[in-house]
């Protein structure tokens, strides 16, 4: 009878120590984030992806985090897109007290290199880099696609908009 109690105690101790190791590993992951996004050429100058958009290989983006209180830059990191127009970067540390956003830096296509300066578009690239935000997937953050624009919209844009059932406030 005593040997069964010792065996049960030993098995319980092994199981509990295994769970403690998993909890520690998960706690370490809370301050490590994988950021994923993409960069495209906005051939219609509408700031959303259409069937005419082209994803850009070799585009540079920058992650910048600033203090909420004084605006001091606390983190800067750059990434370059692959052949599918996608980029990935890993960030460590909890940035709950900071405003973090991804911005376009450089386009590989000189014919598609305009960046909108509209304030509402900068909000589209903001990202939460804290585990204390209610997001279930605490490790991966997916950013809205960012787009460089051409100087003059493509002549095919009105047809693409008609297919979508929209008529944007754009002069062609």
UniProtKB/Swiss-Prot annotation:
The keyword Signal applies. Residues 1-27 form the signal peptide. The keyword Zinc does not apply. GO terms for cellular component: extracellular space. Glycans are attached at residue 70. Keywords: Disulfide bond, Glycoprotein, Secreted, Signal. It comes from the Eukaryota. Its main location: secreted. It is found in: Secreted. Coiled coil: none annotated. Disulfide bonds join 41-112, 44-157, 65-100. InterPro entries: Allergen_Ole_e_I_CS, Pollen_Ole_e1_allergen. Belongs to the Ole e I family. PANTHER family: (RAPE) HYPOTHETICAL PROTEIN, PROTEIN DOWNSTREAM OF FLC-RELATED. This is Pollen-specific protein-like At4g18596. It comes from Arabidopsis thaliana (Mouse-ear cress).
């Amino acid at each position: 009878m005593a040997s069964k109690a010792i065996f049960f105690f030993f098995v319980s101790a092994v199981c509990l120590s295994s769970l403690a190791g998993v909890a520690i590993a998960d706690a370490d992951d809370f301050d490590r984030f994988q950021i994923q996004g993409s960069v495209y050429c906005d051939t219609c100058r509408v700031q959303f992806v259409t069937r005419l958009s082209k994803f850009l290989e070799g585009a540079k983006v920058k992650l910048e985090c600033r203090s909420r209180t004084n605006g001091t830059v606390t983190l800067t990191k750059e990434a370059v897109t692959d052949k599918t127009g996608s980029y990935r970067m890993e960030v460590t540390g909890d940035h709950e007290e900071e405003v973090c956003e991804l911005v376009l830096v450089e386009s590989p296509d000189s014919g598609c290199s305009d960046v909108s300066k509209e304030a509402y578009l900068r909000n589209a690239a903001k990202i939460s880099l804290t585990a204390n935000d209610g997001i279930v997937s605490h490790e991966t953050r997916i950013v809205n696609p960012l787009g460089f624009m051409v100087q003059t919209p493509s002549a095919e844009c009105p047809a693409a908009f008609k297919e979508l059932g929209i008529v944007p406030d754009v002069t062609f």
